[in-house]
C-alpha cells in the first residue's frame, strides 16, 4: 500500500514483466482507484491546514513526482504544488482529477503517468484514452490552462517494456500535437545512452526510479516549459 504523504508545497520563488500489446490488442482492466483514497484524503486534510496558492504549477502523477525530494533545489523560484502518489496510473489521475487537480486552479498542469499502466498490462491506446479523458475533464472547468504530458521514462528495470512505452509516448505525442494548449515533455530521448539503451547513471538501485542526477535532468528539460520563475496567473 503506498504510504500517505502530507502535501508538498514548494514556495521558493515559483513560491514494469513486459506487456507488448499493440494499439489494437486485447485490453486489460485497470486496478481500482479507491486503493488511493487515504493518500488523496491526506492531501485534502493538509490543504485545509495550509491552503496552497492558486495559479501555481501543479504536478500530478506517479512516484516519479511523489519521490522528487530535491524539487525545490532542482526548480528554485517556482511555486509548485506536487500531488504525486506512489504507484498512481493514468486511470487514477482521471478518477481523482476533481480532487487532486481542479481545486488548485493551476496556471500549468504537468502529468507524469502511464508507466505503471503499461506495467499492469494496459495498452498504449488505453493510456492515451485515459489522458484524453483527463484533458476533457480539465477543459470543462479550465478551458485555457496548458496541460503538459511528461513522457513515460526508459528505466532499466522496465526496459523489457520499451516497445509499449515508446508506443504510448508516440500516441500521446501525436494527440498533443493537435492542440496548442497541450505540451509534450520528451524525457525518453535524453535518458538514453549512445547505445540506444537506458542510461544507468540516472536511476536508483531499483533501476526504476530516478536518482538525483535523473531529477536534475528532468528539471533541465522541464524548465523551458515552466516559464519564468514566479510567473503566476489565474487560469
At which residue positions do the language-model features occur?
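Catalytic His-Asp segment of secreted/periplasmic serine-dependent ester chemistry enzymes
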Residues: 154-235
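Sec-exported extracytoplasmic/periplasmic mature domains
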Residues: 98, 102-105, 114, 132, ...
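Charged helix-capping and loop-helix junction motifs
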Residues: 124-134, 164-169
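Oxyanion-hole/transition-state-stabilizing segment in secreted/luminal serine hydrolases
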Residues: 65-81, 90-129, 148, 152-156
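N-terminal secretory targeting modules
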Residues: 1-60, 65, 69-74, 227-235
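Residue-level preference for short coil/turn positions at secondary-structure junctions
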Residues: 52-54, 76, 105, 143, ...
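Short amphipathic alpha-helices and their capping/turn segments at secondary-structure boundaries
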Residues: 45-57, 96-102, 136-139
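Structural recognition of the beta-strand scaffold that forms the well-ordered cores
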Residues: 57-61, 80-84, 108-112, 146-151, ...
